[in-house]
Amino acid sequence: MTETTDFLPRIGALVRDARQQSGLTQAELAATLGTSQSAVNRIEKGQQNLTLEMISRIGKALDSEIVGMGTSGPSHLRVHGETTLSGAIDVKSSKNAGVALLCASLLNTGTTVLRKVARIEEVNRLLEVLTSIGVRATWLNADNDLELRVPATLDLSSIDEAAARRTRSIIMFLGPLLHRAGKFQLPYAGGCDLGTRTVEPHMTALRHFGLDVVATDHNYQATTAVGTGPTRPIVLTERGDTVTENALLAAALHDGETVIRNASPNYMVQDLCFFLEKLGVRIQGIGTTTLTVHGASSISTDVDYAPSEDPIEAMSLISAAIVTRSSITVRRVPIEFMEIELALLEEMGLRYDRSEEYLAENGKTRLV
């Protein structure tokens, strides 16, 4: 693949995302550009050569700079400080939880609706992969509510390899897919090689469910011993968030009890647990390092779930106020994942007030 053609799918994805954000159909964008819907479809799939003039016209039609024309070499930012911030802002939904929930949607053959999903690049890439294997994904409104419909049989042979290789999160497909296919392959996950420290903990956990993975030609060749389940507690060799999530995803469709030790109790893991509970999976120990999961042989239910707010975004906003010596109001802060940091900042001289606690839309996470 040449350097030029390698950029076409990326530009196409940017055009598609900007069009959807603008609320336009392919036909409406085509009419604005004076071209055909099929041409717009080819552009979004990265199958159409584009001139700079056409890219500029698309950008104007969508009120979005698709490609920035800058100089070569390193970029530099000039920051003019001493600007005081003011006002109030709501913390948006967790990006990491959103990614985990997209992978978890593969467990459910019913309709999954996720509320206020963060439309980050990782989410866009995962959606490209999901739709390529047969999942129907629909953005419902401007609030970024997302509907997912997973078919009874996935077309894993049609997986979008280019999109899969641009996301490390593809490794979290192993957990749900090992129950849905006896043999399948996944492209290497964004620079993660089999046997490295970042990948091996996943394999160690998933072997308990009969998964065997061999790396060949930039793909994970996976085979599964159907009906295999843990005969003893799974001890994670790394207390990682995605490792814990992968083990949870595998345990959810194991019709029996799975004990996961050395699990991450982090916010995105808890959000995944709350979502799995809505699917009918029973989980004990949420928020601790030992999880006991009672899975099911199949899941087919209509579920509506809102991931909680992002503590990283909340702390970024608080930090912005601190360094600019500002007084702002940050609403919908997931306080249980920030109390230690705020206590340390208070010892350093930070003064702040906080409201009474209330629950997030998931009915579980404590906010202030």
Where in this protein do the model-derived segments appear?
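Short amphipathic helical patch at the helix-1/turn junction of helix-turn-helix
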Residues: 9, 20-21, 49
